[in-house]
Amino acid sequence: MDLLQRAGLVVGLWVTYHILLGTYNVFFHPLRRFPGPRLAAATQLVNVYYIIRGINCKYLYELHEKYGDVVRTGPNELSFRTASAIRTIYGGNPGPDDTFHKNMIANIQETGDSDNLFFATGQQHNRYRRLIMPVFAERTIQGQGPMMQEYCSQLIQGLRNRCGRGYFPTQDGVVDIVPWTHFIISDILSHMLFGSGMNCLLNGDYHPWVMAGYKALIESTYIEAAHRLRPYHRILEYLLIPTRLRDGFRVHSAVSREKLQARSKEAEPYQFSLPSFTSESLSEQELFDNINVIATAAGETTSSALSAIMYYLTANPAAYDKAVTEVRQAFSNEAEITAASSASLPYLKAVIREAFRIRPTIPVGLHRLTPKGGREIDGKWVPAGTWISVANLAACRTSSHWKEAGRFIPERWLGDPEFASDNRDTSVPYSIGVRNCIGMSHANTQLRLILSRLLWNFDFEACPGNADPYDYLEYGTWQVEPLKLRVVDIRGQPK
């Protein structure tokens, strides 16, 4: 047998193996009775295709609309969309025998022994959370109020300059608001983590650290797609990840490490660590890894949420008018708008909640594994080791949970009896349970304060041609597109 014949035999055996494996997955696998497309049941190639195209969340939404509350989306994978499933999977008993642990294959890591909060499991995760939580405590957040106010003022001045004819006469007051949402969130976040901002607002431009974080988030989604096709994931990482994204992790990590080292030399103790590297503190590497992953995740999700809120407000004049009226009637001058006082605006809070519902910041599911012995989820028995998740977009946009699900209606969060049938427990933008978002309060505080000051200082009007944020591509979170608004300065002096 010559070399060509041997190669043909190997290829033939490989193809035969995968045909037999696909046949087993469809007809004999323990999940065979769950509804879903047969091709997806046979192979992970279907999921990989939709992930790489950036439309996985919409694919899952369509599957749930067709097949119902539980769908088999892969050979060993189920997707849910009910409040019951959310409580069981994410909010259950945190004991070692009952925990729905993270699916480490879908989440890139080889094991749960990790140097960061996002991938660590068990006692390691509990330790990280206990040590990091004080940074995001309410008292700490209120103490950061003056810092956030300073960056809000820089944002106001930046928009004031660009909407005024004296600086940019050809723009006719039209500003793409998306970069500015990135600028302010990145400056606040970097100041919180490193003690100084990245000067995005002052320069009116992206810092390389911000762009690198954006690339890293997309790159991680491609890596997840590749890892779904083990043992071929290493070669697929090389083939799938676009060249333009390959330096994301490297650049972001390098800048973060440089900033962290500079901060450690300051006399002021670093707020994110304890005084000494004992068993009850974060090691230098743990500190770096946790800061890096928090910066990547928090920056993109919060800025994406802020731009989406601005879109839905300006696209819905009635909601916009109510939000503007509430802000301008609640305060007699801008100095009264603080991190604390902006929390007393019920309609603005409803606007934020509704934006999180109609376009969840994390639209896909957070992957978990069923524990040993299997578990009942939403009335269905699910075998141990099954990949499970709740598809956030599907849960938040289905008419079976929400009246007028596709419309932006903040009143549904204010006790309007017309929406009494809404299943509000299916909208959990920060997840629930022991692994819920540690920065939830911080993100909400930023959003309320920034929006309050924007609506106090400016009138906004949507320009034609803006894409609905629901139509954006999704790689971990949404890939925002330009959002052009006509901005009218109602407080500043004419230039």
Swiss-Prot record:
SUPFAM superfamilies: Cytochrome P450. The chain crosses the membrane at residues 8-28. One of its GO terms (cellular component) is membrane. It is an enzyme of class 1 (oxidoreductase). It catalyses: (S,S)-2,5-di-(p-hydroxybenzyl)piperazine + reduced [NADPH--hemoprotein reductase] + O2 = (1S,4S)-4-[(4-hydroxyphenyl)methyl]-2,5-diazaspiro[bicyclo[3.2.1]octane-6,1'-cyclohexane]-2',5'-dien-4'-one + oxidized [NADPH--hemoprotein reductase] + 2 H2O + H(+). Its EC number is 1.14.14.-. It is a single-pass membrane protein. Keywords: Heme, Iron, Membrane, Metal-binding, Monooxygenase, Oxidoreductase, Transmembrane, Transmembrane helix. Pfam families: p450. One of its GO terms (molecular function) is heme binding. The keyword Membrane applies. Pathway: Secondary metabolite biosynthesis. It comes from the Eukaryota. Heme binds at C437. Belongs to the cytochrome P450 family. This is Cytochrome P450 monooxygenase FrzC.
